A protein has these predicted regions:
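N-terminal strand-loop element at the rim of the active site
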Residues: 5-66, 149-154, 163, 229-231
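Acidic anion/phosphate-binding donor-loop and adjacent secondary structure
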Residues: 63-65, 151-155, 165-183
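Short hydrophobic beta-strand element within catalytic cores of glycosyltransferases
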Residues: 287-290
């Protein structure tokens, strides 16, 4: 089967990580290509992590923002590629023209990587009537990534979707030294890591407020934030929190090694789909401390394989951090994380997608 995964870029992020993992796994048995609409840069972390067996293409876009000419570039690339399946991961407006003209001879699959309403924002919201029509006429096969994502999709589009949880490959260490050691202020310091772009969804202002509260209460903790500066307004709000115990690292290429070396993983999001960073955390026994949104409660049971706050507020999250610090059976929680991960391995997920690709 000739398969194309296409996306605006392969920079750091959960969707890009998922595309990389799927493409690498599928390329073991099928002819797989990945196309980046933007020209790859050194920051395109997952472009450089694609297997040599994956064919890589880019459309050379460099200017920010949406341009109509990209629609025609994408159409011509897909039309000439003779693909059996084109797998889209959001940003429908880029692909609408291709879907309507090519759906009779190419199978289009669309993964909704978040809440269906949140996912259809910006330009996708302008295209929403066309998107609804394409889904309802079965021009595209929809896939959702959690029960909550599936529920939101059904509510918005009034049709069903196939549920396939995200997955990742087992951990293979790249670092040769402890990536966290330099951030421990004392031998007892607990180091927490939050990998995520600076954005409304990831709720970093609340995260920093919660950590400031427990630091002010005398807790020996350090928070590391690793991710791109997507929202400059939120970035400015974070400036007062930076200190020797709340540290912004920028984008990192070694997030999974850092998760392996850290004590806990933080994700106080306002909304989510099925966070790939959460799966990366449990795969290495990094205890997750999360808000109960999206597909997170479908992975984490509070006190068993992680900790869930009651909501996404600073007060609730600070209390959950305290619950983690007071936990007396963290080694068992870590072991439970790694056991949970067995259900989210990319080998299983890829087989489920390949089955969807073959559906009539």
């Amino acid at each position: 089967m000739k398969i194309l995964h296409i996306h605006p870029s392969m920079n750091g992020g959960g969707i890009e990580s998922m595309i990389c993992s799927l493409a690498n796994e599928m390329s073991k048995t099928d002819d797989v290509s990945v196309c980046s609409i933007f020209a790859p840069t050194d920051e395109a972390v997952f472009w450089h992590k694609l297997s040599p067996s994956v064919k890589k293409f880019d459309l050379g876009k460099t200017a920010p923002g949406f341009s109509v000419k990209e629609i025609f570039k994408i159409y011509n690339f897909i039309r000439r590629g003779n693909f059996d399946v084109v797998h889209i991961h959001g940003f429908f407006y880029y692909y609408a023209f291709s879907v309507f003209l090519l759906h009779r001879r190419i199978r289009f699959v669309y993964t909704i990587h978040s809440d269906a309403v949140k996912e259809s924002s910006g330009w996708d919201h302008k295209f929403l009537p066309i998107k609804i029509f394409a889904f309802r006429k079965a021009f595209i096969k929809p896939v959702t990534i959690s029960k909550e994502s599936k529920r939101s999709f059904t509510a918005l589009y009034n049709i069903e979707s196939t549920l396939i949880y995200n997955g990742i490959a087992p951990y293979e260490r790249k670092a040769t030294t402890d990536t966290i050691a330099d951030y421990r202020i004392t031998p007892q310091t607990k180091v927490f890591i939050h990998p995520g772009r600076i954005s409304e969804a990831k709720n970093q202002v609340v995260l920093c407020k919660a950590f400031k509260a427990i630091i002010d209460a005398g807790k020996d903790v350090v928070l590391l934030i690793a991710g791109s500066r997507q929202d400059e307004v939120i970035w400015e709000k974070l400036q007062p929190y930076w200190s020797d115990r709340i540290i912004y690292l920028g984008e990192r290429k070694d997030v999974r090694d850092m998760l392996h070396d850290a004590d806990a993983f933080c994700l106080p999001s306002i909304w989510e789909g099925m966070p790939v960073t959460l799966l990366e955390a449990i795969s290495v026994g990094c205890v997750p401390i999360c808000s109960p949104v999206g597909g997170i409660p479908e992975v984490i049971t509070n006190g068993v394989n992680g900790f869930l706050s009651t909501d996404s507020s600073a007060e609730a999250y600070a209390q959950t951090l305290t619950n983690y610090l007071n936990c007396e059976n963290l080694e068992q929680v870590k072991a439970n994380c790694e056991e949970t991960f067995k259900e989210f391995q990319i080998s299983k997920v890829a087989l489920q997608y390949l089955s969807v690709y073959k559906e009539k």
